[in-house]
């Protein structure tokens, strides 16, 4: 989990840092768990841009990840820790006792040769997956389901973890990485530990080309666009934006404007919003 710096023999190397990938044990993924991944370039099924600044980048295959962890009671041995170009976390190839191979999100401390389990009888050990009702209060967890059996949706990014704070009847109370406190049904599963690659947030990309390799395109300021492209556009030279406050490209207030729906179905599950004291 170390970070490598470079001698500034070129301008782009002066700030650039990279992960050492010392936890990675192989560069050859399991072929049976790969599927082709077509480039979307931020377009939807109609060909319209729904996510700006996306396109290009290196070719990649999608790794099929087991987010459900429903193979209960069968031990699985960790065969390798691998890099996944589709996410910030590392992944672990596990081989079950019956011969089946699956990828899981690798937590911090998981090594080749370790044995992981899932189910109500699994030990409270890094990498094991259990329902929240079987996990002790205070445990650090990741890969959390929002609906039982749907698969993990929360706490999957590199270095992230949630904490099980309490249990009340049919619900568990979790503190998420954002600081949000919310209810989750106790039948939902979670994995023990913190997600791997904890130094990902201090990596400095360092140069534009590296960002392009990751599939990101340049971001252009609205004030240098035409008025039909952005509310800040138009005018002669370096003109003011012409509005009392900054706006998004779609005319909504920018910088701190709340975009969450007032009557979202999950409002009743949130005890404390992120950022609140």
Swiss-Prot record:
One of its GO terms (biological process) is cytoplasmic translation. Residues 218-277 are annotated as: Disordered. The keyword RNA-binding applies. SMART domains: Ribosomal_L2, Ribosomal_L2_C. Belongs to the universal ribosomal protein uL2 family. Part of the 50S ribosomal subunit. Forms a bridge to the 30S subunit in the 70S ribosome. This is Large ribosomal subunit protein uL2. It comes from Clostridium novyi (strain NT). The gene is rplB.
